[in-house]
């Protein structure tokens, strides 16, 4: 067995530029296709990255596949073949993410076909941020802690992912929640990051379908796996892609709020 570090960037927006590092345990010599893609209701273009685990690079980023055929479509009859941009990146030119649409993608590599789909659910609006100062204790560092607010719609089955930046630097933590606590109520999750006066906070909340939520929950487990005597890493790499590929293809609506600690 060997461990392979894979850098996943799919769950960040194109403007985000942050990556998640996932440690996969694969059989020696095993090759896996890795596919990463995200469609949002923000202006495109959107990208899909296609790579393979065998022969991974020194920095852990999997080598891109240059000769894949990548198609993205929706349930309204729109379809386009993505343009190759190098290093395994394939980019849309006309696709526009729309709430309520289901998006499909198909990747062909060496005669093998890999598919997935995702429904673009609406997202609640982040309407405000407050800060509370906390003294240092056994569980928290001294500083200001942000609480964000949004009206969660009634009806269970909503899922969300948060991307967080402090002073334009992305935070690494994977934060995904469901609506079990907030269903139909005013959501007020606290961000567990110590801030100081003058810090600039940016929070993006992305809607997820159930497959996206499950994927991120497993990613979070893998990210925080410590290797202790009572811990065990997940036996399977997370994926919502057919035919044994690793990775995730998703569709998300996005809401953004910016704030400064005063």
Region locations from a protein language model:
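Sec-dependent signal peptide hydrophobic core
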Residues: 5-9
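Positively charged n-region of N-terminal signal peptides that target proteins for export
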Residues: 1-4, 20
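C-terminal motif of bacterial Sec signal peptides marking the signal peptidase cleavage site
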Residues: 14-17
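A sequence/structural signal for flexible, mid-protein segments enriched
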Residues: 19-262
């Amino acid at each position: 067995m060997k461990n392979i570090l894979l850098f996943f960037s799919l769950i960040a927006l194109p403007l985000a530029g942050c990556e998640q590092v996932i440690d996969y345990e694969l059989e020696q010599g095993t090759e896996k296709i890795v596919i990463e893609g995200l469609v949002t209701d923000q202006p495109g273009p959107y990208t899909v990255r296609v790579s393979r685990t065998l022969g991974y690079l020194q920095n852990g980023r999997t080598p891109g596949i240059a000769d894949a055929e990548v198609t993205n479509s929706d349930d309204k009859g729109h379809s386009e073949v993505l343009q190759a941009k190098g290093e395994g990146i394939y980019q849309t030119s006309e696709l526009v993410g729309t709430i309520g649409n289901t998006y499909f993608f198909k990747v062909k590599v060496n005669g093998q076909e890999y598919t997935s789909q995702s429904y673009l659910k609406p997202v609640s609006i982040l309407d405000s941020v407050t800060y509370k100062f906390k003294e240092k204790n056994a569980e928290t560092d001294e500083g200001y802690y942000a609480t964000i607010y949004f009206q969660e719609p009634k009806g269970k089955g909503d899922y969300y992912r948060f991307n967080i930046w402090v002073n334009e630097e992305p935070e690494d933590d994977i934060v995904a929640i469901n609506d079990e606590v907030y269903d139909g109520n005013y959501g007020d999750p606290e961000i567990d990051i110590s801030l100081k006066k003058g810090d600039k906070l940016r929070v993006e909340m992305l809607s997820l379908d159930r497959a996206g939520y499950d994927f991120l929950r497993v990613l979070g487990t893998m990210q925080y796996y410590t290797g202790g005597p009572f811990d065990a890493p997940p036996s399977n790499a997370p994926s919502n892609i057919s035919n044994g590929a690793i990775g995730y293809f998703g569709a998300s609506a996005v809401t953004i709020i910016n704030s400064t600690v005063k």
